[in-house]
Amino acid sequence: MKHFKNKKILVTGGAGFIGSHLTKRLVSVGAKVSVIVKYNSIIDCPRLLSIWDKINVIEADLRNVDSVYAIKKLKFDYIFHFAAYNHVGDSFTHVSESINSNLFSTINLLDHGPKYKKFIHIGSSEIYGLQKKLPF
């Protein structure tokens, strides 16, 4: 993790469980971290409270192209893309919301978002669906 020192890093979904842990770790090694959050009420987020004054919080909804355009001029060494529809069980009944959150937000970020050197897209085992044998 030492190679992230002084690197400009954007974490989408940084207020979520895994994203917040990565954000804290990046801050601890000296990275310059920006976090995209959907709602201004994230100020009450206990996961980021301990590092709130050490991160740049950007309120943006990646599903909205205009929101993504607003951050287009920013430049990052790395983007860690954690933002996703996090109700896996509900994704089967709320397909449109799941597609908007997972697919279109990623497309918007890649096509219209800030410049970056490396893009790290995060997934989960759910992408494999129900398998008789684990593919890993």
What label would you give each PLM region?
Residues 1-136:
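N-terminal Rossmann-like NAD(P)+-binding domain of SDR-like oxidoreductases, especially those catalyzing
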